[in-house]
From Swiss-Prot:
Enzyme class: transferase
InterPro entries in the record: DNA-dir_RNA_pol_bsu_ext_1_sf (IPR042107), DNA-dir_RNA_pol_su2 (IPR015712), DNA-dir_RNAP_su2_dom (IPR007120), DNA-dir_RNAP_su2_hyb_sf (IPR037033), RNA_pol_bsu_bac (IPR010243), RNA_pol_bsu_CS (IPR007121), RNA_pol_Rpb2_2 (IPR007642), RNA_pol_Rpb2_2_sf (IPR037034)
Chief localization: plastid
Subcellular location field: Plastid, Chloroplast
Official protein name in the record: DNA-directed RNA polymerase subunit beta
GO biological process: DNA-templated transcription
Catalytic activity: RNA(n) + a ribonucleoside 5'-triphosphate = RNA(n+1) + diphosphate
Length: 1070
């Protein structure tokens, strides 16, 4: 569909616009539509009627702001009020009241919702669009079988197929098929109407005998025959109203409701003129679809490409919220109907307010945001992550595909994705190709299709007009890519340009072009658009880079990149992490947590985010960037947020890197780093962890928060205040008590001390006992307490426990085991931190900061990192920043290389450092060994790329276990750091040990130390004292488990021990 034309050049749309438009569509259209569908409800005697007066519904603004909702773990929602009336039919009296229907979670300025204090976001889902699709398959004998699949709005399917005898069937399941004549008659058509409305009546008459004519002689007979075949019922069922209701519920409602989009698709595909408001499948649809199926069999018509985006629709946040709203209203209807009947039965006088409660709507939305697979916790690792999360497209979820069953063809890139879905950005692993990302300029149309903008090329008009095309329309135009400069009207000579037409790529004269792309980034997502020189990288590495940029941790001292693409400012602006001036005025005062702005005669106080925890435990913090007395304009940046500098995205650091081997410490993607990165806090990041504890009412009394905890050392309680809560600002170590809590419990007589027994015997005093259930700081949690929150829910009952939350700030320098990465998929683990004097150094004496392995470049084909590295060196010397759009080879051949070499040459001239650009090996330089002072044999590439520190840090992953819990069934150590699990000796580890012939070590690891219950208890003592581990006489537990599993299959397995002396077989029971 062609969108409205916009004259002039295009601008980058708001990156959160997809979420905003969806939520506004729900509020403006979905909410009233759902309320208008609410039926009138009558009691059983039909004396009282309840109805909603939808015209006067109201949505009230929330009573709390977003910050308080997060602080108190509440939902940021609006209250929905609707006028309702009770009508007594006998007297025609009306009682009208405004009722509170429930709370609807609102969307904030970031495109997210706050539910129970947690930022959540709803993902857009890609589903098969309702309508009819024709395909051809080969049967076992090699003959083509043509089928037409009708997909309903609910996802139900009805297949029409034609067999060898030209008989047409409607298949309702794999084993059940029904004659199309029976189906059409059951839907209300008689035989004469069927034959009048089809193009090939002779085919329909050919397989109709006298018995079949009797079956469809009347509508009742057709319904009975349809029910007999559909439900596989034997005998002669009797026509009744309940039988029709069962068919309506099990078949017609699931498979025949097309919806608004399905009706439009059916009309277009079958050339029908049925009104749009008729959203159910009609006999005319069935018969016309059968005519098309017959035409397909005889070579007329085109089969459908099921993976084309014109056959898909986007289930946006508006559709999901509207579905949940309809579900809540159905529950409300059932509740009102039951309440009215109960009130009449007990002879009570109901009122509208008594009949309606807010529970159905509120609980429906809370369960949706908390449990639905498409409602996810917002990833707040960095500003880029927040934006990209809201632009994801998923084939998974209810009604969609699964990672186990999706085929390769569905996951693959399709030509219709051009300018709509990024061909680069997708998840890695089992969901590859099933979770994608919207292209930058793409938008979701009113019919659920993804539209992409193009410039119209017209010889008649000199004006540039921008059109938004849906996937079903752009294949009829010659579309030139935005990489070509031959579309300039000033170029008179005839030139050929690459173009796309009907999913094929052609080379045509530029006069034949109808449309052209508007931007080189048009077909990329945000993550891929931030990769400089992406055209020089392999697509797999570009995919890794776009994913790893979302894992970058905000650093304490952010720095914007020397080499970028120009989108960094837009991403930082739309992420909402920076403070933006909403009015113009003058700055009158600034401090760390607030900015005061005087404008329009008022003084505005703008609060700043100070050390706030994100959902990924990173630190969100804003730093003022304006000074007192400065004049500010509307839209100007007042404060930078996490990972932003001067309003631009700043995820990493520009560091000096050399590509060369160094003593094997950077082999296999390992990275050697300079100690300067540690001591100067180059890659230092802050992380905030949340620890919470609740107080409950037990059967022996309520739990108490106190600082008087018996049987604990005073050293562990040193940070508690008089209330038993850790003091704000204190430094805590592993094992320290954060909150002191005692839980009452029943004491046994044997547990009393002699003093307690004496008090009970003499004075009759009942000594209360309690168990220590304090909140202790777990391993790896050391840091500074920056916030303490004591949340007391209203009511104070046992069902609303008090919650105490402790927030601890950790300062993490880069260390061995941390993961670092560039923007080209070049990732590695820090293997060694070398002193500055031992690091390789350049000809001007500067030691490099990192040493990468040069072998990681050619095999991975991500040469873009070399261009960025060299250009970053030139920019660092010249104090310049570069913003380069991709595919700059459209200007001339080797444009990237020429740009890099020219900047290196200029840097060497201006700084009088000829080693920066040496004609014999441009981009390389001689590097000296810091330990000996001698130069390395070969010159190496060195420069200043942009390197990120990722959230995969060794502090979160390192784990050790001496002994711990074992699985109950296999008696093997548990798996995972969270469960204090043990090491896994897998196949490859066994192969490595087998290669060295260490049979005894293998036996110990696989049996004695793992799942042999008796022997593993003796291993520790034997290891300490010395000696050999005694050989067990029975089998390990995993072998015993295997024996029992085989016994469950009626197979008996015995094992035997062979004596070395006489080789006699002694039978041992397993």
């Amino acid at each position: 569909m062609l969108g409205d034309g916009n004259e002039g050049m295009s601008t980058l749309p708001g990156l959160n616009q997809i979420q905003f438009e969806g939520f506004c569509r729900f509020i403006d259209r979905g909410l009233p539509e759902g309320l208008f569908k609410f039926p009138k409800i009558e009691d059983t005697d039909q004396e009282i009627e309840f109805q909603l007066f939808v015209e006067t519904y109201q949505l009230l603004e929330p009573l709390i702001n977003e910050k308080d909702a997060v602080y108190e773990s509440l939902t940021y929602s609006a209250e929905l009020y609707v006028s309702a009336g009770l009508i007594w039919k006998s007297s025609r009296d009306i009682q009208e009241q405004t009722i509170f229907v429930g709370n609807i979670p609102l969307m904030n300025s970031l495109g997210t919702s706050i539910v129970n204090g947690i930022y959540r976001i709803v993902i857009n889902q890609i589903l098969q669009s309702p309508g009819i699709y024709y395909r051809s398959e080969l049967d076992p004998s090699g003959i083509s079988v043509y089928t037409g699949t009708i997909i309903s709005d609910w996802g139900g399917r009805l297949e029409l197929e034609i067999d060898r005898k030209a008989r047409i069937w409607a298949r309702v399941s794999r084993k059940q098929k029904i004659s199309i004549l029976v189906l059409s008659s059951a839907m209300g058509s008689n035989l004469s109407e069927i034959l009048e409305n089809v193009c090939y009546p002779e085919i329909f008459v050919s397989f109709l005998n006298d018995k079949d004519k009797k079956k469809i002689g009347s509508k009742e007979n057709a319904i009975l025959e349809f029910y007999r075949q559909f439900a596989c019922v034997g005998g002669d069922p009797v026509f009744s109203e309940s039988l029709c209701k069962e068919l309506q519920k099990k078949f017609f409602q699931q498979r025949c409701e097309l919806g608004r989009i399905g009706r439009r698709n059916m009309n277009q595909k079958l050339n029908l003129d049925i009104p749009q408001n008729n959203t159910f499948l009609l006999p005319r649809d069935i018969l016309t679809a059968a005519d098309h199926l017959i035409g397909m069999k005889f070579g007329m018509g085109i089969l459908d490409d099921i993976n084309h985006l014109k056959n898909k629709r986007i289930r946006s946040v508006a559709d999901l919220l509207q579905d949940q709203f309809g579900l809540a209203l159905v529950r409300l209807e059932n509740m009102v109907r039951g309440t009215i009947c109960g009130a009449i039965r007990h002879k009570l006088i109901p009122t509208p307010q008594n009949l309606v409660t807010s529970t159905p709507l509120t609980t429906t939305y809370e369960s949706f945001f908390g449990l639905h697979p498409l409602s996810q916790v917002l990833d707040q690792t960095n500003p880029l992550t927040q934006i990209v999360h809201g632009r994801k497209l998923s084939y998974l979820g209810p009604g969609g595909l699964t990672g186990r069953t999706a085929s390769f063809r569905i996951r693959d890139i399709h030509p219709s994705h051009y300018g709509r879905i990024c061909p680069i950005d997708t998840s890695e692993g089992i969901n590859v190709g099933l979770i994608g990302s919207l292209a930058i300029h793409a938008r979701i149309g009113s019919w659920g299709s993804i539209e992409s903008p193009f410039y119209e090329i017209s010889e008649r008009s000199k004006r540039i007009r921008m059109l938004y095309l849906s996937p079903s329309r752009d294949e009829y135009y010659m579309v030139a890519t935005g990489n070509s400069l031959a579309l300039n009207r000033d170029i008179q000579e005839e030139q050929t340009v690459p173009a796309r037409y009907r999913q094929e790529f052609l080379t045509i004269a530029w006069e034949q072009v109808h449309l052209r792309s508007i931007f080189p980034f048009q077909y990329f997502s945000i993550g891929a658009s931030l990769i400089p020189f992406i055209e020089h990288n392999d697509a797999n590495r570009a995919l890794m880079s776009s994913n790893m940029q979302r894992q970058a941790v905000p650093l304490s001292q952010s720095e914007k990149c020397i080499v970028g693409t120009g989108l960094e400012r837009q991403v930082a602006l739309d992420s909402g992490v920076s403070a933006i001036a909403e009015h113009e005025g003058n700055i009158i005062y600034t401090n760390t947590d607030r900015i005061f702005l005087f404008g329009n005669g008022d003084t505005l106080s703008i609060p700043l985010t100070i050390y706030q925890r994100s959902n990924k435990n990173t630190c969100m913090h804003q730093k003022p960037q304006v000074r007192r007395g400065k004049c500010i304009k509307k839209g100007q940046i007042l404060a930078d947020g996490a990972a932003t500098v001067d309003g631009e995205l700043a995820l990493g650091k520009n560091v000096l890197v050399a590509y060369m081997p160094w003593e094997g410490y950077n082999s296999e993607d390992a990275v050697l780093i300079n100690e300067r990165l540690v001591y100067e806090d180059i890659y230092t990041s802050f992380h905030i962890r949340k620890y919470e504890i609740q107080t409950h009412m037990t059967s022996y009394g309520s739990e108490r928060i106190t600082n008087k905890i018996p049987h604990l050392e005073a050293h562990l309680l040193r940070n508690l205040d008089k209330n038993g809560i850790v003091i704000l600002g204190s430094w805590v170590e592993t094992g320290d008590i954060l909150v002191g809590k005692l839980t009452p419990q029943m004491a046994k007589e044997s547990s009393y001390s002699p003093e307690d027994r004496l008090l009970r015997a003499i004075l009759g005093i009942q000594v209360s006992t309690s168990k220590e259930t304090c909140l202790k700081l777990p391993t790896g949690g050391r840091g500074r307490v920056i916030d303490v929150r004591w949340i007391q829910k209203k009511g104070g009952s046992s069902y609303n426990p008090e919650t105490i939350r402790i927030y601890i700030l950790q300062k993490r320098e880069i260390k061995v085991g941390d993961k670092v990465a560039g923007r080209h998929g070049n990732k590695g683990i820090v293997s060694k931190i070398l002193s500055r004097q031992d690091m390789p150094y350049l000809q001007d004496g500067r030691p490099v900061d990192m040493v990468f392995n040069p072998l990681g470049v050619p095999s991975r084909m991500n040469v873009g990192q070399i261009f960025e590295c060299s250009l970053g060196l030139a920019g660092g010397m010249l104090e310049r920043h570069y913003r380069i759009t991709p595919f700059d080879e459209r200007y001339e051949q080797e444009a990237s290389r020429k740009l890099v070499f020219s900047e290196l040459y200029e840097a060497s001239k201006q700084t009088s450092n000829p080693w920066i650009f040496e004609p014999e090996y441009p981009g390389k330089s001689k590097i000296f060994d810091g330990r000996t002072g001698n130069s390395f044999k070969q010159p190496a590439i060195m420069g200043k790329p942009y390197i990120l520190k990722l959230i995969h840090q060794v502090d979160d992953k390192i784990h050790g276990r001496s002994s711990g819990h074992y699985a109950l069934v296999t008696q093997q150590p548990l798996r995972g750091r969270a469960k204090q699990g043990g090491q896994r000796v897998g196949e490859m580890e066994v192969w490595a040990l087998e290669g060295f012939g260490v049979a005894h070590i293998l036996q110990e690891m696989l049996t004695y130390k793992s799942d042999h219950i008796k022997t593993r208890q003796e291993v520790l003592g034997t290891t300490i004292i010395g000696g050999t581990i005694p050989k067990p006489t029975d089998a390990p537990e995993s072998f015993r488990l295997l024996v029992r599993e085989l016994r469950s299959l009626a197979m008996e397995l015995n094992h035997f021990l062979v004596s070395e002396k006489n080789f006699r077989i002694h039978r041992k029971e397993a």
